[in-house]
């Protein structure tokens, strides 16, 4: 694999993340009846560049009592994993066409828990540690439903390869037959990416800023990039799973445009949710998953496993 292939994937993602921060600030501004960033460049369009320069020229301070190696390693690991999640995403062709692309995404997103845990523990601050423990409990819990929902979709798809979902959804998007799963998937992705109303890890009122409270400058920017790269990746995955983009081999660009548009609409929904809803209480968050989502997803998964056999039909690609 050539370096240019990897760079042509990473650079657009980082640019998308930069402008997503601007989009978020603008949308939140207009929803709160104010302008948002509008000084740097025309309509504030150069604000992300100014933010990046400001963050990376500041001195990265490290608490005297922190664990030096882990403190530095955690943000690096977070961004590396966030970018590696994009490897099997078909846009329309993935960087590496993995046979078990879905399992790869699940494994990588599970590993991201370590970066949060290390950052909280290495900071040697009680606020950071409480934030990290909350984040880990939340991420691990919601990954259970994400995995079960993915399994149900793969049963319908008949293969663990993400590229085949385009063929499966040629005649009908999977959101129509699987709409209860799609609703739970969307809410679980909100929780998985620590977004409002599930941003308990960053509860400013009680935890100052969450697991990254001791981070400043460059390392903080890496966490920030990782979080937003994960948001875009989750939305791209949602678009692929439930809103399969039409793929014409003659015009692969159309597939990319289609996917980008759907991802953007879903990302706008993430921002809309953030502007509209208050934060959940921690026990409500856990009850929602273990008492509502888990039994429902398990029942629907059983249905999708048994339905093809019951009706003597076979899923496509079997």
Curated annotation (Swiss-Prot):
It is an enzyme of class 7 (translocase). InterPro entries: NADH_UbQ_OxRdtase_su1/FPO (IPR001694), NADH_UbQ_OxRdtase_su1_CS (IPR018086). It is a multi-pass membrane protein. GO terms for cellular component: mitochondrial inner membrane; respiratory chain complex I. The chain crosses the membrane at residues 3-23, 69-89, 100-120, 135-155, 171-191, 223-243, 253-273, 293-313. GO terms for biological process: mitochondrial electron transport, NADH to ubiquinone; mitochondrial respiratory chain complex I assembly. It holds the Pfam family NADHdh. The keyword Mitochondrion applies. Keywords: Electron transport, Membrane, Mitochondrion, Mitochondrion inner membrane, NAD, Respiratory chain, Translocase, Transmembrane, Transmembrane helix, Transport, Ubiquinone. It is found in: Mitochondrion inner membrane. GO terms for molecular function: NADH dehydrogenase (ubiquinone) activity. It catalyses: a ubiquinone + NADH + 5 H(+)(in) = a ubiquinol + NAD(+) + 4 H(+)(out). Its EC number is 7.1.1.2. Core subunit of the mitochondrial membrane respiratory chain NADH dehydrogenase (Complex I) that is believed to belong to the minimal assembly required for catalysis. Complex I functions in the transfer of electrons from NADH to the respiratory chain. The immediate electron acceptor for the enzyme is believed to be ubiquinone. Belongs to the complex I subunit 1 family. This is NADH-ubiquinone oxidoreductase chain 1. It comes from Dasypus novemcinctus (Nine-banded armadillo).
